[in-house]
Amino acid sequence: MKNILSRFFPIIPAAALLALSVFQPSCANTTQAPTGGAKDTLPPVIRRVVPAPGTASVPVHGTKVVFTFDEYVTVKDPKGIFLSPPQKKSPKYKIKGKSLVVYFEEDLLPNTTYTLDLTGAIADNNEGNMFPGFTTAFTTGETVDSMFVTGIVQDCNNLRPIKGATVMLYKDQSDSAVFLRRPVAAVKTDDWGYFSLRNIQDTVFRVYAIVDGNGNNIYDPDEDRIAFLDTLFRPVNVVNDTVAELRKYDMKDTLACQSRKAELRLNVFREKPSKQLLMNKVRTGA
């Protein structure tokens, strides 16, 4: 009998320990929030563009450009969606799934190369990681223009770079062109006042830059500041994938941004307003 009891009772402590181990999680600390995994710090990546970069014979009417990303995105700054040559009305857009659809309210010009730039416009939908930018080129003619020019726009008083200035090219060499019509090619400067104006014609241009107060891509002396190149300019560099100046840079990378080559330097100033006054009134006829 004793042997039977000694063999039976040692089971009880083991069973008790098993019960404690089963019910112990119910006493765990529940105040710690779940981590949810690592924070997403990567910007969106473009997977597809339609029409593809370099497409020719694009229709002048009803054209839209679709950028498809690897994740859901949002438009942070609509002004960052910039068409060159600019139209009277800015491009419109809508988000459709993981795609950004850009369309134009005006017909495109015939036999014209266009660039559509997204610098500073797009971020991912969850963490707000900014898309570094992308420029696509297409043409309504047979061949995409292939030249480019780089430069810096700065304040003439302190030589500080000017962000968001509009650099404009005109084939019309008259002084009045910048007052009356939009340019044949244009681009916005980045945070460092730097610009790379790509897919332009191999021809002679007048070069201007304006701080465009009302965003109409025409120089308004009462509102805008202006810079200009005092000589005619003809581009000498050809677009290709290996050109460092055509890449999109992280604006926080000071060394890389300041190391970019700049062909032109444009110093912005404000013109003094001039008013025509009637100094004297004389009656000369009967």
Segments from the language model and where they lie:
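An amphipathic, aromatic/His-enriched active-site/gating alpha helix that lines ligand/cofactor pockets
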Residues: 219
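Bacterial N-terminal signal peptides
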Residues: 12-25
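Acidic carboxylate motifs that coordinate Ca2+ or other divalent cations, activating on Asp/Glu
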Residues: 216
